[in-house]
A protein has these predicted regions:
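Conserved catalytic or regulatory cores that recognize and/or transform ribose-phosphate-containing ligands
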Residues: 1-101
């Protein structure tokens, strides 16, 4: 079981990864809303915090996370999810190879 993580601005890449990982035989858990792609509900008071907490529960259920890091972009929320997953012994995979600093 794998949970997708990343900026919701990358909706198409989320959907592509979900399809590919599913066809590879994985159970895929994704985001519920794409806030950067027009889901206005995300920006109401308290909703983003609720969704962030809920996404950590999705990470708890998974064996690994798959980070949608288009162009190497990893935002603050995604970085927090990666740290959370790592602390909890989850494997972390990336759509694009990490850039060396």
């Amino acid at each position: 079981m794998v949970t997708l993580c990343g900026s919701t601005r990358f909706k198409e890449q989320f959907l592509e990864a979900q399809k590919r990982l599913t066809l590879e035989g994985n159970i895929v858990i994704s985001v519920g809303l794409f806030g950067h792609s027009g889901d206005e509900e995300v920006w109401t008071e308290g909703t983003k915090e609720m969704l962030d907490n809920m996404h950590k529960r999705k990470i708890d259920m998974a064996d690994s996370i798959y980070v949608i890091n288009v162009g190497g972009y990893i935002g603050e929320s995604t970085r927090s999810e990666i740290e959370y997953a790592t602390r909890n012994g989850k494997e972390v995979e990336y759509l694009e190879p990490l850039k060396k600093d």
